[in-house]
Amino acid sequence: MSCDMEKTMSSVDSLPATPASEVPVLTVSPADTSLNSADVKTQEVKPEEKKPAKKRKSWGQELPVPKTNLPPRKRAKTEDEKEQRRIERVLRNRAAAQTSRERKRLEMEKLENEKIQMEQQNQFLLQRLSQMEAENNRLSQQLAQLAAEVRGSRANTPMPGSPATASPTLTPTLFKQERDELPLERIPFPTPSLSDYSPTLKPSTLAESSDVAQHPAVSVAGLEGDGSALPLFDLGSDLKHHSTDDVAAPLSDDDFNRLFHGDSSVEPDSSVFEDGLAFDVLEGGDLSAFPFDSMVNFDSEPVTLEGIEMAHGLPDETTCKTSSVQPGFGASTTRCDGQGIAAGC
């Protein structure tokens, strides 16, 4: 028996050895256990089970006449009623499609017309632009020619021999000089000649003899009392030749009233001037013969009363009475009035 076993082993060893790659692998993969094979079978079965696609009918096909007359709001139940509803839907769709096509056609026509108009306008603007460019080039050339001619004329024009005197500019120095105060001694005042003024009215024609202590006299002192004399009449150079009686003769009450107050009657005198000067005191009643300049003294040297005796019309202050010094009702107590008449003696 042992011999048989040895023979068997030797026979097995004597068999040719098979490569390992030829040995079948007895393993189970996860793909073999999946359900992909079943899905493939179902996919293969589905196309066969699908219903054939509904064939769309051609446009313009005549529709059959519906067999029923179902109201619009009633639900279709029978096959004839359903066919009626289908025919109604087709008719509505055809009408809507026709309306849509017509609307699109009108819109397209409108757009085409606008396109044509814009093309024409664009063409016109291009032509206008070309014309303006040509005009601009022509004007630019003319401007260049004129500029060249002007430069040539300036170059050929000779320069003047003596340049124009430059006008003085406004500098702060000029303004400062204008602001400086000019003294009165440097201001020239024209002195008119005494021959130009020939007064026709003299104080001697107005003066009358009266009591000196009872009637006020004409004051020749200044309004401010600064000692400067302001005579009422311009005597000029005749002051040296006339007597002092003509100069210092006092005025009477009548003359005084006629000169400064006018007539005291109820009816106003038409010959009285606004400042109280009566026209009847003038020679011939002519106002033009009595210039106002005769009231002003243009002598450079003021006339003083130092050389005039007080007995000829200007009494001494000590001889005046206290009652005559008191001003009248309404008169100023501080200074004389504008006519140069003293409030008192």
From Swiss-Prot:
Name of the protein in question: Transcriptional activator hacA
Pfam families hit by this protein: bZIP_2
GO biological processes: positive regulation of transcription by RNA polymerase II; response to unfolded protein
Region Leucine-zipper: start-end pairs: 139-146
Region (Basic motif): 85-138
Keyword annotations from UniProtKB, A to Z: Activator, DNA-binding, Nucleus, Transcription, Transcription regulation, Unfolded protein response
Protein family: Belongs to the bZIP family.
Coiled-coil intervals: none
Assembly information from the UniProt record: Homodimer.
Biased composition annotated in UniProt, kind: Basic and acidic residues: 41-51, 77-91
Compartments, record wording: Nucleus
